[in-house]
């Protein structure tokens, strides 16, 4: 029985030793993974800004300090571009409306001309010349 106890004791100690070694390697790998993640976080912080820094990036200048020449030029170019786009839009709208009104007037003139022509044909008695040639000149 003693040899069985010795074998069981050695197997048990081997299992305990292997489990400790396995935990140790997983811990060491885990710390290496953590170190890699921390390194990637540092790289991300170097590349990307914090959200608060990004929102205040263009507002670093104090309210009373004068704008730089570049800022003034950029703002003026943006304003001019917006004005140009607005002008083009309203010009296009005006042209479309003018075309619409012109077509409506042309159609109305055509309808009234046809109505006058029909009235003249209906009331022409054949005895007198038509209205165009029956003008009284003084």
UniProtKB/Swiss-Prot annotation:
InterPro entries (alphabetical): UCMA
Superkingdom assignment: Eukaryota
Tissue: Predominantly expressed in resting chondrocytes.
The keyword Coiled coil is assigned to this record: yes
A Pfam family recorded for this sequence: UCMA
Coiled-coil ranges from the UniProt annotation: 90-122
Keyword Protein biosynthesis annotated: no
Keywords from the UniProt entry: Coiled coil, Extracellular matrix, Secreted, Signal, Sulfation
UniProt PTM: Proteolytically cleaved by a furin-like convertase to generate a persistent C-terminal fragment found in almost the entire cartilage matrix, and affecting osteoblast differentiation.
Subcellular location: Secreted, Extracellular space, Extracellular matrix
An individual GO BP term: negative regulation of osteoblast differentiation
Propeptide residue span(s): 28-64
Molecular-function annotations in GO: BMP binding
Signal peptide (residue range): 1-26
GO cellular component, one term: cytoplasm
Disulfide bonds: none
Primary role: May be involved in the negative control of osteogenic differentiation of osteochondrogenic precursor cells in peripheral zones of fetal cartilage and at the cartilage-bone interface.
Similarity annotation: Belongs to the UCMA family.
Protein name: Unique cartilage matrix-associated protein
Lineage of origin: Eukaryota, Metazoa, Chordata, Craniata, Vertebrata
Encoding gene per record: UCMA
């Amino acid at each position: 029985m003693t040899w069985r106890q010795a074998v069981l004791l050695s197997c048990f100690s081997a299992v305990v030793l292997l489990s400790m070694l396995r935990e140790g390697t997983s811990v060491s790998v885990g710390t290496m993974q953590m170190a890699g993640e921390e390194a990637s976080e540092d790289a991300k912080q170097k590349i990307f800004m914090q959200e608060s820094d990004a929102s205040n990036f263009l507002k670093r200048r104090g309210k009373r300090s004068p704008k730089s020449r570049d800022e003034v030029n950029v703002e003026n170019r943006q304003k001019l571009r917006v004005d140009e786009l607005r002008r083009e839009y309203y010009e296009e709208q005006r042209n479309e409306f003018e075309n619409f009104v012109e077509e409506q007037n042309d159609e109305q003139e055509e309808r009234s001309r046809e109505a006058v022509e029909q009235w003249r044909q209906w009331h022409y008695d054949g005895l007198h010349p038509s209205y165009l040639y029956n003008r009284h000149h003084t």
